[in-house]
Amino acid sequence: MTLLIDNYDSFSYNLYQLVGALGPPVRVIRNDEMTIEEIRALHPDRIILSPGPGRPEDAGITMAAVQLGQEVPLLGVCLGHQAICAAFGGTVTYARQLMHGKQSRVIFDRACPLFRGLPEQGLVARYHSLAVAADTLPPELKATARTEDGEIMAVQHRQYPIYGVQFHPESIMTPEGKTMLKNFIEE
């Protein structure tokens, strides 16, 4: 079962539908609905931290849930990505440019399991005003995708199956998004 922690965002249900279409059952909980121990008791096979409004520290148990990536594969999308970076000590700040419903060209590190089988570059959908400051990326995390001007668009933990993407793989404006989510599910 894939557990989707919903940060009160309409994109959560796009993720729910796309991941569900890829096979595994998906359970959705709100970010203030359960404790970390209650989540552990569900024995999820993987966890997705959804997009959402605001800052990671204001998103219920989302930042605390990052620790579960030491036990099962974990993917953070947009706010979920920011929560991963912040949980390890990175700084979330205003993005260089507000990106709401815009596509950007991104360069992928194809050694990252999420980007297996993808071209070296691709278009992704962006809906965010906050981003991780590149000079504060914690040493535990490795940048695995960047915009052409160097803004971090994805990270991977160096030891655990923890991944974050600033962009929206569930959007039709991310043509390879379904492949990325399939790669995560197969992790």
Q: What is each model feature region?
A:
Residues 78, 128, 168:
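Histidine-centered divalent metal-coordination motifs
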Residues 1-3:
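Extreme N-terminal starter segment of soluble prokaryotic enzymes
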Residues 16-25:
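Two-component/phosphorelay signaling modules centered on CheY-like receiver
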Residues 112-159:
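Catalytic beta-strand/loop cores that center a nucleophilic Ser/Cys/Thr
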Residues 24-34:
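A short beta-strand-loop structural module common to alpha/beta enzyme folds
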Residues 172-187:
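Acyltransferase
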Residues 35-43:
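Short amphipathic alpha-helix with an adjacent loop that forms part of the alpha/beta core around
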Residues 44-112, 116-117, 181-182:
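Cysteine-nucleophile active-site neighborhood
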